[in-house]
Regions:
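WD40 beta-propeller blade core
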Residues: 74-75, 120
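Well-ordered alpha-helical scaffold segments within catalytic/enzyme domains
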Residues: 125, 178-198, 295, 310-328
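Extended ligand-binding groove/face enriched in aromatic
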Residues: 154, 170, 204-352
């Protein structure tokens, strides 16, 4: 008999940044005496050089916060049940404004941290794995999603996911998006089984899974070549053209190789490739709904074998989980599977 794994509640870091002049910052932080801690009796390796620890604060349950003058903050929690949580490291730009810690003020399980250029409040929030997953999924959809693809995105302001830059293609767009979609499909499968397919939890998971999977599947059709060629990623004409590979701009029934260092090196600038096979409307809606047409698409050339592995894994799970109730999607999956495998075989088991 299969038994589910039950994860206990766990403290996770939630970070807030403040200016030193912000009235929400406790005045005690700046008036707190700075006393160099004795770390010689801590029976574990510490992430910063011992001589750089120059301030400390005592929290609840035996927790000791240790500030380094050069390399951030350490949390020593000898009573944590998980060994991995006994020593934790906090640094800029994720947790601190910078790594030059000046003063600490414990606040229950949490801590205020003054560094050279600002203040951080580190909340060690007790949450379930489900709560943490929901928080991370929300941040992913707000801060990383690009035309449905999930890989990475730069920020203009540290820790502010609303400041994401409006571009950011990645060679892993296909693979990472496919893998993200698999996770959301499994979430949908569990929620549908436990709470019903029409429950808000199941419908939310299905919505996220479909968008991500369709974005990954689109890369198997977007070139318009109709021969199973899989693109690595794509951008629109509103995005910055990277100079790190072969890119093709779609123009009517053709796609033209644009100028990059790679295309010049290979003497491929201006080369025309067939693009007459229509992109399925359902998948093209990912960019058309944002106001872009087929002629606004610039796709990146052939992808790699690890991306293909992720694509096929996602198609398998989509066929099993989403396909039974979505024959249109299942047909797109089967067509992509056949054409991609045929392409690989015909090209000597390579992806070009």
């Amino acid at each position: 008999m299969i038994h589910p794994i039950c994860f206990p509640m766990h403290r996770s870091r939630v970070i807030s940044f403040y200016e030193k002049t912000d009235l929400r910052v406790p005045a005690k932080l700046f008036a707190h005496p700075v006393i160099k801690p004795d770390v010689s009796n801590i029976p574990y390796p510490l992430p910063s050089a011992l001589e750089t620890y120059h301030c400390a604060a005592l929290g609840e349950d035996g927790v000791v916060w240790l500030g380094s003058s050069t390399t951030g903050l350490t949390r020593y929690a000898p009573n944590e049940p998980r060994k991995a949580d006994v020593i934790q490291y906090f640094s800029a730009e994720r947790d601190l404004v910078d790594n030059h810690v000046r003063a600490l003020l414990a606040d229950g399980h949490n801590v205020w941290v003054e560094t050279e250029n600002g203040v951080s409040f580190i909340e060690m929030r007790l949450m379930s794995m489900e709560e943490k997953a929901a928080m991370l999924t929300k941040e992913t959809l707000i801060g990383i999603d690009r035309h449905g693809m999930i890989s990475h995105r730069a920020l203009m302001r540290d820790n502010d996911i609303t400041s994401r830059v409006p571009y950011g293609h990645c060679d892993n767009d296909g693979g990472f998006t496919a893998e993200f979609a698999i996770g959301e499909m499994m979430r949908y499968d569990v929620m549908a089984r436990e709470k019903g397919p029409d429950s808000p939890e199941a419908q939310d998971a299905k919505r996220v899974a479909l968008r991500a999977f369709e974005a990954a599947l689109l890369l198997m059709y977007i070139s318009g070549r109709g021969d199973g060629f899989v693109a690595r990623s794509y951008i629109t004409t509103s995005e910055i053209l990277p100079d790190d590979g072969l890119f093709y701009r779609k123009e009517g029934d053709y796609a033209v190789c644009v100028e990059t260092r790679a295309s010049k090196r290979k003497n491929m600038v201006g080369k025309k490739i067939d693009a007459s096979t229509p992109v399925p409307d359902r998948l093209a809606e990912l960019y058309r709904s944002e106001g872009f047409s087929d002629s606004d698409i610039i796709y990146k050339g052939d992808t790699s074998s690890d991306e293909i592995t992720a694509h096929f894994a996602a198609m398998y799970f989509a066929h099993k989980i989403l396909g039974p109730d979505d024959p249109e999607l299942d047909d797109l999956i089967q067509r992509a599977t056949r054409s991609t495998m045929q392409h690989i075989v015909e090209h000597g088991f390579e992806l070009w």
